[in-house]
Amino acid sequence: MNKPAVSRIANILKNSKNFFLATTDGKRPYVRPFNAVVEYDDKVYFYTNNRTHAFKQIETNPFVELCAMIGEGYDRWLRVSGKVEYDYREEVKKAMLDANPELRSMYSEDDKIFYVFYLSNMSATIHSTQTEPEEIC
């Protein structure tokens, strides 16, 4: 994926108060708020821990979707979908923790429950109630 697209997606997610991750257990969809993201190695990274329902659902079905509102209004949003790929490198965990220092009260780089991931085969589109969808990647 090209760097401008990655940076644009990361910036939209960083600037949204929260964004939402959708998973499924094979029968039902589940959505929960997320709020930590980091751009690293030309990828957008997120985190979870291996004690959550989200982690278990991702293990069953690694295809997820994210959604974030853009700006202050309610007429634009970003949808991102792809396949979760875990990255076990400590430097990626460090980048996540450095970009989101509030996580340091819960996790460390060598923490065995802290999982950092990116989306492979990522597609991202900005939707609006006023205009046609804009494909980012």
Q: What residue ranges belong to the model's regions?
A:
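N-terminal leader/targeting helix
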Residues: 18-46
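A generic structural signal for short beta-strands and their flanking turns/coil linkers
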Residues: 15-17, 40-42, 60-64, 74-82, ...
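Charged, amphipathic alpha-helical segments
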Residues: 4-7, 48-54, 101-102
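Short glycine/serine/proline-enriched coil/turn segments at secondary-structure junctions
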Residues: 28, 74-76, 127
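Charged, gly/pro-rich active-site loop segments
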Residues: 78-137
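A short mixed-secondary-structure module that forms the rim of ligand-binding clefts
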Residues: 37-73
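A short, Trp-centered hydrophobic/proline-enriched beta-strand micro-motif
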Residues: 11-26, 64-68
